[in-house]
Amino acid sequence: PRRVEPVREEKSVGTETTFFDTVTDREHARVVLLDQTHQCAARLRASDLRCRVVVLKARGADFTTVTRSRTLSVPTDLAHDIWETVSSLYSALPTPAGGFRLLGVRVEGLLRPDDGVQLLLGEDPRRGASERAADAVRRRWGSSALAPASLLGGGTGAARAPRGEVRQRGREDEEGR
């Protein structure tokens, strides 16, 4: 028999949203993916990890599931970098017949700073400072204290889905969403 290990190293970080009603509006789906990207990046930074692989998961109304992944040239913990990849993968993905039933973002190939992560020559050490500052604001004032404007729904029609419309899977924040 194998020994039970109560704590084990994370192999991936991700979150998924299952919709009660299928989503056919690609802009609404894009906003959901952006929110998930920020959640994943914040969890990476909180765990002092960087990722090498970004994965997009989509399930259609007929329950057909498609995953697309891309390996990054440089490991990252920044939502901006992860979003560029998620957005590119999503743009190449057609809307399934009947719409999306589930969308998810996952990052894999996790590395710790002591794993010898190589930085780019000439990389600005301040890069990512704004995301780390936003993390500090959210820790102090709650997860809804600060968000990208596109997640606020200020008249663009791309509002964050009300809590009753979705079921989230993934590690939740201390507020218990």
Indicate where each model-derived feature is located.
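DNA-contacting surface of Y-family translesion DNA polymerases
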Residues: 1-100
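Acidic, metal-coordinating catalytic segment for phosphate/diphosphate chemistry
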Residues: 74-177
